[in-house]
């Protein structure tokens, strides 16, 4: 299918619309200031991804803030740094300060003219309203993977979503819906040297808009 043939976009929020990694790295600085030597950013972020992955099955129990608080604690242990639960909660409450990628608001404004837009974003209830406002979304357009898993046909049917007409916009190594399309955003130039492992590969949300405009002219 071509880009203009899809009816809905299912967009991952973090690292597609929101610069989560920069937000996490900035919020980790008070912890890293106590490290015996300055840790490498790639090592720290890989460690963060690892601990988040192990904690994610407890999302319903912990909530997003709790998940981040425990991740802060576990990451500190991996790095051999002493920390407190209070510091962990301060880190967890940094989420509203995570910035949008510069091209995200304009891209969302354009794309909503042509698609139904749904966004995957794990956030606590008190943070969801602000995120919807920043992205120009209705509250029911903000979904969580814990309640709306990609492999569950029930909620897709309830929301009148045909997987075959839905394009997932995510970052590597994401997968598409069962028979839907996949668009991978590769903001890192080093990723561009790799073959595109999706139906569409883009370098930014602005690039997705440009490709859509080009498709309309064909």
Question: Predicted regions: what is each one?
Answer:
Residues 47-48, 91:
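Short alpha-helical scaffolding segments that buttress acidic/His motifs in well-ordered protein cores
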Residues 89-98:
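Surface-exposed cleft-lining segments at the edges of enzyme active sites
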Residues 31, 103-114:
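Catalytic-core regions built around general acid/base machinery
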Residues 1-47, 78:
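Active-site neighborhood of HAD-like aspartate-dependent phosphohydrolases
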Residues 1-7, 109, 120-218:
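Asp-based, Mg2+/Mn2+-dependent phosphohydrolase catalytic module
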Residues 53-89:
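A metal-dependent, Asp-based hydrolase signature
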Residues 22-26, 102-106, 130, 196:
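Generic recognition of short, well-ordered alpha-helical segments
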């Amino acid at each position: 299918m071509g880009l203009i043939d899809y009816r809905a976009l299912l967009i991952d929020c973090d690292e597609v619309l929101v610069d989560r990694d920069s937000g996490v790295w900035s919020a980790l600085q008070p912890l890293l200031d106590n490290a015996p030597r300055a840790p490498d950013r790639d090592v720290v972020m890989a460690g963060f991804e690892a601990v988040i992955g192990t904690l994610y099955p407890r999302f319903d129990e912990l909530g997003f803030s709790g998940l981040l608080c425990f991740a802060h604690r576990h990451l500190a242990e991996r790095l051999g740094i002493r920390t407190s639960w209070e510091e962990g909660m301060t880190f967890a409450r940094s989420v509203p300060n995570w910035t949008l990628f510069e091209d995200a608001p304009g891209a969302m404004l354009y794309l909503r003219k042509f698609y139904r837009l749904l966004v995957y974003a794990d956030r606590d209830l008190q943070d969801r309203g602000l995120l919807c406002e920043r992205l120009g979304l209705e509250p029911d357009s903000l979904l969580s993977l814990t309640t709306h898993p990609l492999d569950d046909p029930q909620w897709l049917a309830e929301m009148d979503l045909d997987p075959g007409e839905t394009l997932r916009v995510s970052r590597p190594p994401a997968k598409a819906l069962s028979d839907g399309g996949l668009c991978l955003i590769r903001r890192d130039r080093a990723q561009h040297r790799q073959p595109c492992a999706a139906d569409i590969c883009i370098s930014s949300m602005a690039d997705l808009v440009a490709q859509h405009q080009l498709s309309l002219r064909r």
